[in-house]
Amino acid sequence: MARSKTSQRWLKEHFDDPYVKMAQKDGYRSRASYKLLEIQEKDRILRPGMTVVDLGAAPGGWSQVTSRVIGDKGRLIASDILEMDSIPDVTFIQGDFTDDAVFARILEAIGENPVDLVISDMAPNMSGVRAADQPRAMYLCELALDLAGRVLRPGGDFLIKIFQGEGFDTYHRQVRDSFDKVQMRKPLSSRDRSREQYLLARGFRGV
């Protein structure tokens, strides 16, 4: 079957993308690594020895960046519905984050030790119908915030991909109620046409 013009356009954009080329050169699994690297350069959210949870981790771009910074004294628990090739010293849990059993497995892997940082690059499979996609995206954001509220230590941080649209303002207020400082980030490596932004919440106030 011949490729559609849309898919041909996407392929051209993908292979012409400088961040895709950089990822191949630098040994990262995806261009998404540079989004976290940009945020790290500006905000220094990752430090050696931290305990971090990475949601929506596959194919592993953010986990690669995180594991390199936190080092062998840090701890990283990653999860995704998709398979992810192993990364040294990373605990990976495969499953649907919206499934209570998978959520429980993540909590079990974290254990009793409080977490310093929760990061999430999760997004639903986009249909292109904004009225359907936005609620699914916000639902994932709600679940990630719920997890963060359960596992973060007081003073911990939370970084999540979020899309502008219905439910954004309410969610932003929810996060503000639990953290000292909330900022929005749009990395240069995030495509201009994408509605995605990253919400960075710092200073978890505790339950």
Curated annotation (Swiss-Prot):
Pfam families: FtsJ
Enzyme nomenclature, EC number: 2.1.1.166
Catalytic activity of the protein: uridine(2552) in 23S rRNA + S-adenosyl-L-methionine = 2'-O-methyluridine(2552) in 23S rRNA + S-adenosyl-L-homocysteine + H(+)
Active site: K161 (proton acceptor)
Compartment list: Cytoplasm
Keyword rRNA processing included in the entry's annotation: yes
One GO cellular component term noted in the UniProt record for this chain: cytoplasm
UniProt record similarity statement: Belongs to the class I-like SAM-binding methyltransferase superfamily. RNA methyltransferase RlmE family.
InterPro entries associated with the record: RNA_methyltr_RlmE (IPR050082), RNA_MeTrfase_FtsJ_dom (IPR002877), rRNA-MeTfrase_E (IPR015507), SAM-dependent_MTases_sf (IPR029063)
Keyword set, alphabetical order: Cytoplasm, Methyltransferase, rRNA processing, S-adenosyl-L-methionine, Transferase
Gene that encodes it: rlmE
Function: Specifically methylates the uridine in position 2552 of 23S rRNA at the 2'-O position of the ribose in the fully assembled 50S ribosomal subunit.
Presence of the UniProt keyword Signal in the record: no
Residues reported in the UniProt entry to bind S-adenosyl-L-methionine: G60, W62, D80, D96, D121
Organism: Ectopseudomonas mendocina (strain ymp)
Enzyme class at the top of the EC tree: transferase
Major subcellular location class: cytoplasm
Protein name: Ribosomal RNA large subunit methyltransferase E
GO molecular-function terms, A-Z: rRNA (uridine-2'-O-)-methyltransferase activity
